[in-house]
């Protein structure tokens, strides 16, 4: 049967020994080289690739923040036009302080999973900016910023407090007041009724209390939304600070202590409201500065309690269980 050779010549047979000699392939010309190999021979491309590889870590974070500029523009407008409280600036400042404190420890090789998540969230925030509510799109954008920061931070930094600060940087107090303000006022009024009933004749109707014949309304500032924000902000900041001295403190420790933070905030808001209502029911017409003094005193006590909860030394866990 004849043998057909496609594309390659048949092997040569030695006349003396009858052995089949391997066919030598012709040397490759530059046209046969892979495209990447040809690019690597271009000096300009190599120097450009080296400059990208040696770019400082802060430059990538700055580029990520620049890509999210529509979100920051919207946040600035919402904070400055009076439609929301500018407390989110504190959370952004805390994230900036965290990055600055670890500027010499930023990873030269970022964690690819978090970097991919940052890129995906950035694309999602850009694509949905005109299709989702502004607050939802901003949430995705700030999660992208947090994921990018986590990608470059040292592995020992807890992830959960960083994500928490990114959420708290949103201008969301007005939205929380709209959706959760009334339920919180009802819960606060009912808890205050239990405490006041020991000394006064109290009845509750919605978010209002009838104390000894005096109608006292638990208004929006008494809902505790701002105390909730400040409480969780304190928890995130103290957790990141505590971890500098207690390496066993991780994201799991932070999450397991969050319920205690919620309880402290709720108790503090109930105590503040009870003191103010008791003063009004007793005929003490407290001035505005007295209301503020009571509120700030209770807030300071709540934040101190949260700092104590988050600052407790964490038990040392096995390496496989740390996050």
Region spans (language model):
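Hydrophobic N-terminal alpha-helices or hydrophobic patches in metabolic proteins across all domains
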Residues: 2-14, 18-323
């Amino acid at each position: 049967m004849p043998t057909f050779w496609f594309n390659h010549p048949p092997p040569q047979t030695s006349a003396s020994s009858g052995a089949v000699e391997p066919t030598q392939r012709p040397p490759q010309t530059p046209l046969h080289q892979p495209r990447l190999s040809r690019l690597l021979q271009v000096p300009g491309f190599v120097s450009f690739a080296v400059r990208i590889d040696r770019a400082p870590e802060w430059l990538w974070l700055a580029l990520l923040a620049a890509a999210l500029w529509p979100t920051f523009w919207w946040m600035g407008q919402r904070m400055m036009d009076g439609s929301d409280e500018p407390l989110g600036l504190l959370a952004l400042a805390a994230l900036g302080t965290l990055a600055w404190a670890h500027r010499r420890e930023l990873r030269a090789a970022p964690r690819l999973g978090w970097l991919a998540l940052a890129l995906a969230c950035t694309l999602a925030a850009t694509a949905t900016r005109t299709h989702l509510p502004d607050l939802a799109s901003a949430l995705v954008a700030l999660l992208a910023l947090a994921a990018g920061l986590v990608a470059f931070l040292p592995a020992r930094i807890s992830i959960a407090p960083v994500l928490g600060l990114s959420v708290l940087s949103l201008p969301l107090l007005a939205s929380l007041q709209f959706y959760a303000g009334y339920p919180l006022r009802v819960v606060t009024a009912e808890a205050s009724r239990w405490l006041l009933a020991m000394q006064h004749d109290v009845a509750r109707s919605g978010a209002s209390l009838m104390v000894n014949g005096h109608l006292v309304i638990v208004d929006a500032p008494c809902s505790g939304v701002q105390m909730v924000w400040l409480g969780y902000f304190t928890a995130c900041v103290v957790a990141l600070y505590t971890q500098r001295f207690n390496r066993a403190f991780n994201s799991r420790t932070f999450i397991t202590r969050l319920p205690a933070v919620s309880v402290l905030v709720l108790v503090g808001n109930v105590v503040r409201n009870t003191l103010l209502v008791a003063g009004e029911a007793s005929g003490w017409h407290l001035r505005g500065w007295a209301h503020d003094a009571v509120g700030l005193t209770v807030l300071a006590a709540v934040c101190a309690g949260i700092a104590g909860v988050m600052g407790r030394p964490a038990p040392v866990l096995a390496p496989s269980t740390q996050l």
